[in-house]
Amino acid sequence: MRLNEIFMSIEGEGIRTGATSVFVRLHGCNLRCSYCDTLYAVEGDDFAEVHAEEIVRRTLSYGIPRATVTGGEPLIHGEIRELLEALDRNGVETNVETNGAADIPARWPNVFYTMDWKTPTSGMSGAMRMSRAASLTERDVLKFVVGSERDLDEAESVVRELASLHGDPRPTVYVSPVFGAMPYDRIVEGMRMRTALRDFARFQVQLHKIVWDPKRRGV
């Protein structure tokens, strides 16, 4: 596997916001989002080739029962099943951050998925499939990074369709701003004006970009 970095920090977003976790960042992605803030994990050769067992060993060495596997896009790696299975077996509650353009490989008791549905501002919305979002469970997270009213419309449409399938969207739904692109109050007002987002979604900001310099790595 191509490992870009591994470090300990706090969760900056999602259902574990503020909790200390071990972050495993894998290199490589099948998308090229316009606002990507981790291009160093997408392009170039800033990575080391390591086996899944070595990543597990290093993760466990921190002594923290939580991990986030991110990228890039972690689900495109051949050893991802082996990695997640081993983390699960060792009792590590693992959040897998995926871009919505790769199928969820399997389910394990200690593993959940955070799917980032790509809105039009990303330039990658054509890669999204409702079937992938519909496969998320109550343990998972679906997030929308928005930078325009059109993005909010897209999020509203997806959440409404998921709610029609299940009675509620099933995963916990978050709406986040593209950093620096749209005023927070405008996003919140937009959520209030859209029924599905008002009823089911939560607004969030990336906490780590408030605590540290937004461009800082390893946090």
Language model: regions and residue ranges:
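Short hydrophobic/aromatic-rich motifs at helix boundaries and adjacent loops
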Residues: 27-29, 55-56, 128
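Conserved AdoMet/S-adenosylmethionine-binding subsite of the radical SAM
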Residues: 76-219
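Flexible, acidic/Gly-rich N-terminal and inter-domain linker regions that tether
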Residues: 1-27, 31-35, 39, 195-206, ...
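Conserved Radical SAM active-site core
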Residues: 1, 8, 20-21, 32-112
